[in-house]
């Protein structure tokens, strides 16, 4: 029997996931419709479509995984369904991190203003590289998934054998594998996109600082369109940075700390794990004129439906 606190946080988790699924689904539908109509997408829309799709699938699979683990704790450890779910989750986690990184790089390249030849070359070439970067991210995620699958399959086979050297129990052996294999693998495979993400934001902050210094003697600097564009993008990226960092840290902690479903902190921890992919889509929608207009119309229609 779940406690009142657990039921409360479980309800928040379900609501958060459904809102994220709706927001990511909205982005995917909008961009898919545009792709069908025009036959092509802008580089930024390609990244947003990829990011929205991976997050949509990640939340659906994560929702199933959280409840399956909570309701069938004993069966979860020895079920083949765990390997299947982990296979999808590992791929989607890696792909989502990479797609989010390319989004931050695109922000930096489009808005930042540097005269370095390497940056100018990247600004010129990046739009054409986006499809290949997305395909490369999928390939890297597939390779990472295979490495995680090997570890998960080893755990499953060990659980069936129950034979270990010395007096080691399965729980102790599994714990050692988590620390010696899964955690280093997660750190290595996520540190590269996370580093690129941080570099992009730092470059954008530096560009904004330099632009502000050049415009500080201009009485209309606050109304300057470029300054306003920098400020809006910076606020969006800072919020993305906080959510991205929270997602990264929580994922690393999740690899080392196992919280059982009967623990009172299980559902609050699930909320933290899925917070970024649920909140950030709404930030993207509110900062995108095309998304914002359609989303506002849908909200008005929904409001009118419930009022009547």
Curated annotation (Swiss-Prot):
Disulfide bonds: none annotated. Keywords: G-protein coupled receptor, Glycoprotein, Membrane, Receptor, Sensory transduction, Taste, Transducer, Transmembrane, Transmembrane helix. It is found in: Membrane. The keyword Glycoprotein applies. It is a multi-pass membrane protein. Residues 28-60, 112-128, 206-239, 286-308 are cytoplasmic. GO terms for cellular component: membrane. The chain crosses the membrane at residues 7-27, 61-81, 91-111, 129-149, 185-205, 240-260, 265-285. Expressed in subsets of taste receptor cells of the tongue and palate epithelium and exclusively in gustducin-positive cells. Expressed in 15% taste bud cells in circumvallate and foliate papillae but only in 2% in fungiform papillae. Expressed in the duodenum, antrum and fundus (part of the stomach). Its main location: membrane. GO terms for molecular function: G protein-coupled receptor activity; taste receptor activity. Glycans are attached at residues 152, 167. InterPro entries: TAS2R. PANTHER family: TASTE RECEPTOR TYPE 2, TASTE RECEPTOR TYPE 2 MEMBER 41. Most taste cells may be activated by a limited number of bitter compounds; individual taste cells can discriminate among bitter stimuli. This is Taste receptor type 2 member 41. It comes from Rattus norvegicus (Rat).
């Amino acid at each position: 029997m779940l406690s009142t606190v657990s039921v409360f946080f479980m309800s928040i988790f379900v609501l958060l996931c459904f809102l994220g699924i709706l927001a990511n689904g909205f982005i995917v539908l909008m961009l898919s419709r545009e792709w069908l109509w025009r036959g092509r997408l802008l580089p930024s829309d390609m990244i947003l479509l990829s990011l929205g799709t991976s997050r949509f699938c990640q939340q659906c699979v994560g929702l199933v995984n959280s409840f399956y683990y909570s309701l069938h704790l004993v069966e979860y450890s020895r079920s083949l369904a765990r390997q299947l779910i982990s296979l999808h989750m590992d791929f989607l986690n890696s792909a989502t991190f990479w797609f989010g990184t390319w989004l931050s790089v695109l922000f930096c390249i489009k808005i930042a203003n540097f005269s370095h030849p390497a940056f100018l070359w990247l600004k010129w070439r990046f739009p054409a590289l986006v499809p290949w970067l997305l395909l490369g991210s999928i390939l890297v995620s597939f390779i990472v998934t295979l490495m995680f699958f090997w570890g998960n399959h080893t755990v499953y086979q060990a659980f069936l054998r129950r034979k270990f050297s010395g007096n080691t129990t399965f729980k102790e052996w599994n714990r050692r594998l988590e620390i010696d294999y899964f955690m280093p693998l997660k750190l290595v495979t996520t540190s590269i996109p996370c580093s690129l993400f941080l570099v992009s934001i730092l470059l954008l902050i530096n560009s904004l600082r330099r632009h502000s210094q050049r415009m500080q003697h201009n009485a209309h600097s606050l109304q300057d369109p470029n300054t306003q564009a920098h400020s809006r993008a910076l606020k969006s990226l800072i919020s993305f940075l906080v959510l991205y960092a929270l997602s990264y840290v929580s994922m690393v902690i999740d690899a080392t700390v196992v919280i059982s479903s009967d623990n009172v902190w299980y559902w609050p921890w699930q909320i933290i794990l899925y917070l970024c992919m649920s909140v950030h889509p709404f930030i993207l929608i509110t900062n995108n004129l095309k998304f914002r207009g359609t989303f506002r119309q849908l909200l008005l229609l929904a409001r009118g439906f419930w009022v009547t």
